[in-house]
């Protein structure tokens, strides 16, 4: 038996191709049914996200070409063209790859935790469709355990590595808990949307979104149970904010020193935190000269992100060591499975010999034959029958001069020669 991981991701293919290979929830259901009923595949799990699509299969024999043929056929794509952007891992490499993916080591953002939840969802879906057997059940449970160990024993997810996340972390560092803070977000683009999501998880007292287009502001505010104001209302509402985070596409500053001075006066000079992650800047640099206004720019955050990325890369090296060790452990378990059938077959053969000879001995005893002679005959015949195969193996190895084979047979038979 072998395990194969066939996939495509942000490193190997553009989004236009990744879209074509992605599986919708309905398609995953159909695909798992096809793979489960396929003659070559024993088990299957399909992981499909915006950045990657991966099919994990266990097969009786190595046959990655069959899996590629199935994938291209399922999506109606040219097999040759698809193969240019596909990667394939087999055996220990496939196991190692799965564990690396689950730990976020193969993600666009190093160490991101979302992929683990997506793999768990893929595994549960495969179980629901009876596409997971003993091997994959053990493999994926082991993978989840490894991901937890990496999170616990390294700092892979401890530091912010996006500007949006760093902005929220900076606010937390300064204020501690954010549950008593009022936050003003200026803009409604992708970066501010990410900031809003990170903020919402920290449960600030209030989030207000200010934007030139109120419709976009409302769409974002609805996601975080926030309020909406127009940009023109900033001068009259600024004093209510403890934290201001801005990221618009404006070519000129939106907040000047004078407006902030007025807001601080209305707040009785209670400090304000300004985080400007726009390029060009939304907040005049002179704001940082005010005693009770603390201004951080996108460059400040990029420095934090760069330092944190270095820390994550160091943690990733520690994670690789853990993953390598756990891959070896799983391979040992796989190999132990290969011995189970052999042991069962050998035991059945011995039991057959025993039953045959015991039945003959009992028959002889029933005819009145001397019991001692019957027992001796039984012992001799049982010994000869059990010794026949290893004796032949020893003789053959000796004739061929296979010293290593002879030593292996001695070890197997427990023969200790001085």
Curated annotation (Swiss-Prot):
Enzyme class: oxidoreductase
Family: Belongs to the glutamyl-tRNA reductase family.
Binding locations of NADP(+): 187-192
One protein family per Pfam: GlutR_dimer
Marked site (Important for activity) residue numbers: 97
Oxidoreductase among keywords: yes
Enzyme Commission code(s) on record: 1.2.1.70
Catalytic site: 50 (nucleophile)
InterPro entries for the chain: 4pyrrol_synth_GluRdtase, 4pyrrol_synth_GluRdtase_dimer, 4pyrrol_synth_GluRdtase_N, GluRdtase_CS, GluRdtase_dimer_dom_sf, GluRdtase_N_sf, NAD(P)-bd_dom_sf, Shikm_DH/Glu-tRNA_Rdtase
Description of its domains: Possesses an unusual extended V-shaped dimeric structure with each monomer consisting of three distinct domains arranged along a curved 'spinal' alpha-helix. The N-terminal catalytic domain specifically recognizes the glutamate moiety of the substrate. The second domain is the NADPH-binding domain, and the third C-terminal domain is responsible for dimerization.
Note: During catalysis, the active site Cys acts as a nucleophile attacking the alpha-carbonyl group of tRNA-bound glutamate with the formation of a thioester intermediate between enzyme and glutamate, and the concomitant release of tRNA(Glu). The thioester intermediate is finally reduced by direct hydride transfer from NADPH, to form the product GSA.
Stored PANTHER family: GLUTAMYL-TRNA REDUCTASE
Alphabetical keyword list: NADP, Oxidoreductase, Porphyrin biosynthesis
CDD domains from the UniProt entry: NAD_bind_Glutamyl_tRNA_reduct
Catalysed reaction, written as an equation: (S)-4-amino-5-oxopentanoate + tRNA(Glu) + NADP(+) = L-glutamyl-tRNA(Glu) + NADPH + H(+)
Pathway: Porphyrin-containing compound metabolism; protoporphyrin-IX biosynthesis; 5-aminolevulinate from L-glutamyl-tRNA(Glu): step 1/2
Top-rank lineage group of the source organism: Bacteria
Binding site for substrate: 49-52, 107, 112-114, 118
A GO MF term: glutamyl-tRNA reductase activity
Protein purpose: Catalyzes the NADPH-dependent reduction of glutamyl-tRNA(Glu) to glutamate 1-semialdehyde (GSA).
Name of the molecule in the record: Glutamyl-tRNA reductase
